[in-house]
Amino acid sequence: MADQVFPELTVGVFIFNEAGELLLLKSHKWPGKYVVPGGHVELGERIEEAAIREAKEETGLDIYDLKFINFQQFIYDPAFWKKRHFIFFDYACKTGSVEVKLNDEAEEYVWVSLEAALHLPMDTYTRTSVELIVAGNLS
């Protein structure tokens, strides 16, 4: 891959099941940390469309009722497996299923309460958005 010229626009998807539990994944991209599904917004794609697509690709889940949480800047964080500059747009959403089908980007998953999530090793960006959700700071 060529050197990065511009920040990359990405989306993070905070998926809640009908029991109010949050889906967290472990990925080789964030060693030892829990994260949420997500990825790049493709050219010509709306951010919400990217969230729906990424959730389906990474988990097999259909999502609905997307609510914007926040955006965060990620500039060359050594916690990530590559030197990148991202702009994250995070969304909370719902799913009617708990049948997760992981693709090759994740190694394992858990459904947890928000309270339990706060006690897990999450990356800084995921933790920030979880704390905003707990505080009720959704747009």
Describe these PLM feature segments.
Residues 1-22, 92:
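Conserved N-terminal beta-strand and adjoining loop/helix that marks the start
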Residues 5-7, 81-87, 106:
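A generic structural micro-feature
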Residues 17, 21-57:
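Conserved Nudix-box catalytic region and its N-terminal flanking loop in Nudix hydrolases
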Residues 17-20, 28, 92-99, 114-116:
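Short loop segments at secondary-structure junctions
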Residues 62-71:
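A short coil-to-beta-strand element that immediately follows conserved catalytic motifs
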Residues 72-99:
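Active-site-adjacent beta-strand/loop module that shapes the phosphate/pyrophosphate-binding cleft
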Residues 92, 101-133:
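NUDIX/MutT-family hydrolases
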